[in-house]
UniProtKB/Swiss-Prot annotation:
This is Kinesin-like protein KIF2B. Plus end-directed microtubule-dependent motor required for spindle assembly and chromosome movement during mitosis. Has microtubule depolymerization activity. Plays a role in chromosome congression. InterPro entries: KIF2A-like_N, Kinesin-like_fam, Kinesin_motor_CS, Kinesin_motor_dom, Kinesin_motor_dom_sf, P-loop_NTPase. Residues 213-543 form the Kinesin motor domain. Keywords: ATP-binding, Cell cycle, Cell division, Centromere, Chromosome, Coiled coil, Cytoplasm, Cytoskeleton, Kinetochore, Microtubule, Mitosis, Motor protein, Nucleotide-binding, Phosphoprotein. Residues 585-605 are annotated as: Disordered. The modification Phosphoserine is found at residue 204. The lineage of its organism: Eukaryota, Metazoa, Chordata, Craniata, Vertebrata. Belongs to the TRAFAC class myosin-kinesin ATPase superfamily. Kinesin family. MCAK/KIF2 subfamily. It comes from Mus musculus (Mouse).
Length: 668
């Protein structure tokens, strides 16, 4: 064990005093205090002194292992100031002993004061046993300088801690905001960032809409299992009770992604958490009482196939079975029978009848009579009648649900690229009120077939393509009828489709009320179809705003452009042809006395006007689902070739006329 021989405490070193002069105080074998990299201070034996480079080598034993290191002289003097001067050793002050108890690790003695170097009786390596070190009563406080190695270690440690903090922040942000396994990671991040900046309002603050003839609502469904498996993104945001936003992902020329946010405004917008009861409260429920006042109400669901139309109208699906008790069919029936029992309408002695039929391929079939084919005719009073349609009297909600289940079991369905059980027909369920055998009011609930793009059915069978064409044709006709209803036009083009023909009484008259529920899919893969649905519904909403100018709404950017394309193509074509025919005689009249060649232009014009009937003939041939499309295409190409020849002849004669006019102007 080392002896308790103490060296006197030296005064504070002057920075100008050369360090090499202090090597006279050092000798191999003395015991000095050193500081480890983990801030521990303990004793070690000097084994080597390098006077040229000003460093010493020390050794010590720790846990039975002999260790050593090189230390700068300045660092040793900071911890052992007694070695600074021999003269101060002679005049040292009395010291008081302090006992330091070693820790579990040998050589691990910690103290807040400075250590005083000691010289042992013999040259032995400190083993870390219990030692009593003499510390001055008034210790000299000196600033210890860290070695370059220690400073570099501390610098690296700070950088490491900073990197770890940044990584933890990034991981926490990713865990809260986005799923890093999503292939559309960047798009999801931009959508979430945009949503955080929006001020959303709760659906509970909704109030029932005021009475009006047209009501347009939008309902968003949640992501289904297939979309979740494909890691599809939800690109639909409903920030308030009447605003729908679509975040369309696009790509710049430099391949960077960005969002194009399109905003639509409607009477009401329902998010994916809204129930059928909530949707019914603000859509069909305000129209129920109108049929007791001799009104004709219509509520139809429109949207892409697989967007939730049948779920909204009929109820939720449990596998392949449908729970019809929570659909709009059942909710309307409940309110109808409740109003029948009120004193105001009980005295009318009204009876309720139910009908259920579908429109498939331009033909009408009775779903309550084994899909019997029906005829749609007009009677002497110009009222549309569905000949042979079976009407069954109902007295409670259960009987209505039985009719709905029977009709749904017979309804035409098929498989598409989006939905394995897609409805391929328009289903119309009607609740009719009669008083004394005469019609009193009628509520038509229409579950429309899903609208489809031609690009989606390009690889489908011919039958499926013809179905989609007929569906889109009837939906366009329905839009034109709603336009006429919103503008209070005297003429309604209901004859353009069987759907609008059977619903004629819902579009004509002051007691007609219409409610549209546009269902949309939230997935990014359905973005194009969703935008088409919202544009269709927004057009209906714009028409409703013309009838109710006091209601303000935010229209989507660029919505004026589709209105310019809304004109009928046939009428536009006819007006263009008429202008071309008129321009030629006008030029003839002006230049009749100057050139005799212009008289021959009347022949192409007459040929053009005689062929104006070609499109009508082709339409008659292609009318209906069973039309021969190949024959119509061949006939159209033949007529177009003839017209191209006529136009080429006119072009040559106009060029000749221009040349003659130029020559005449040069002569003058």
């Amino acid at each position: 064990m080392a002896s308790q021989f103490c060296l006197p405490l030296a005064p504070r070193l002057s920075p100008l005093k050369p360090l090499k002069s202090h090597f006279t105080d050092f000798q191999v074998g003395i015991c000095v205090a050193i500081q480890r990299s983990d801030k521990r201070i303990h004793l070690a034996v000097v084994t080597e002194i390098n006077r040229e480079n000003s460093w010493v080598t020390v050794e010590w034993v720790e846990k039975g292992v002999k260790k050593g290191k090189k230390i700068e002289l300045e660092t040793v003097l900071l911890l052992n100031p007694a070695l600074a001067s021999l003269e101060h050793q002679r005049s040292r002050r009395p010291l008081r002993p302090v006992s330091v108890v070693p820790s579990t690790a040998i050589g691990d003695q910690r103290t807040a004061t400075k250590w005083i170097a000691m010289i042992p009786h013999r040259n032995e390596t400190p083993s870390g046993d219990s030692q009593t070190l003499m510390i001055p009563s008034n210790p000299c406080l000196m600033k210890r300088k860290k070695s370059p190695c220690l400073r570099e270690i501390e610098k690296l440690q700070k950088q490491r801690e900073k990197r770890r903090r940044l990584q933890l922040e990034i991981r926490a942000r990713r865990a809260l905001d986005i799923n890093t396994g999503n292939p559309n990671f960047e798009t999801m991040r931009m959508i979430e960032e945009y949503r955080r900046r929006l001020d959303s309002s709760k659906m509970s603050s909704l109030e029932p809409p005021e009475d009006h003839r047209i009501c347009v609502c939008v309902r968003k469904r949640p992501l289904n299992q297939r979309e979740t498996t494909m890691k599809d993104l939800d690109i639909i945001t409903i920030p308030s009770h009447n605003v729908v936003m679509v975040h369309e992902s696009k790509q710049k020329v430099d391949l960077t992604r960005y969002l194009e946010n399109q905003t639509f405004c409607f009477d009401h917008a329902f998010d994916d958490k809204a129930s059928n009861e909530l949707v019914y409260q603000f859509t069909a429920r305000p129209l129920v009482e109108s049929i007791f006042r001799k009104g004709m109400a219509t509520c139809f669901a429109y949207g892409q196939t697989g967007s939730g139309k049948t779920h909204t109208m009929g109820g939720a699906f449990l596998g392949k079975a449908q729970d019809c008790s929570k659909g709009i069919y059942a909710l309307v029936a409940q309110d109808v029978f409740l109003l029948l029992k009120t004193p105001a309408y009980e005295k009318l002695e009204l009876k309720v009848y139910g009908t259920f039929f579908e429109i498939y391929g331009g033909k009408v079939y009775d779903l309550l009579n084994w899909k019997k084919k029906l005829q749609v005719l007009e009677d002497g009073n110009q009222q549309v009648q569905v000949v042979g349609l079976q009407e069954q009297e109902v007295s409670c909600v259960e009987e209505v649900l039985n009719l709905v289940e029977l009709g749904n079991s017979c309804r035409t369905s098929g498989q598409t690229s989006v939905n394995a059980h897609s409805s391929r027909s328009h289903a119309v369920f009607q609740l009719i009120l009669k008083a004394g055998g005469k019609l009193h009011g009628k509520f038509s609930l229409v579950d429309l077939a899903g609208n489809e793009r031609g690009a989606d059915t390009a690889k489908a069978t011919r039958k499926r393509q013809l179905e989609g064409a007929e569906i889109n044709k009837s939906l366009l006709a329905l839009k034109e009828c709603i336009r006429a209803l919103g503008k209070n036009k005297s003429h309604t083009p209901f004859r353009a489709s069987k759907l609008t023909q059977v619903l004629r009484d819902s579009f004509i008259g002051q007691n007609s009320y219409t409610c549209m529920i546009a269902t949309i899919s939230p997935g990014m893969t359905s973005c194009e179809n969703t935008l088409n649905t919202l544009r269709y519904a927004n057009r209906v909403k714009e028409l409703a705003l013309e009838a109710r100018p006091y209601h303000h709404c935010v229209s989507p950017p660029g919505h004026e452009v589709p209105l310019m394309i809304e004109n009928d193509n046939t009428n536009s074509g006819k007006s263009l042809q008429r202008d071309e025919v008129i321009q030629i005689p006008t030029v003839e009249k002006e230049e009749e006395k100057e050139s005799d060649e212009l008289t021959s232009k009347k022949e192409p014009a007459a040929s053009w006007s005689r062929s104006n009937q070609w499109w009508e003939a082709i339409q008659e041939t292609a009318e209906g689902v069973n039309g021969d499309v190949d024959f119509c295409i061949a006939q159209s190409l033949s007529v177009l070739e003839q017209k191209i020849g006529v136009l080429t002849d006119i072009q040559k004669k106009l060029q000749s006329l221009r040349e003659d006019l130029q020559k005449k102007s040069q002569v003058e």
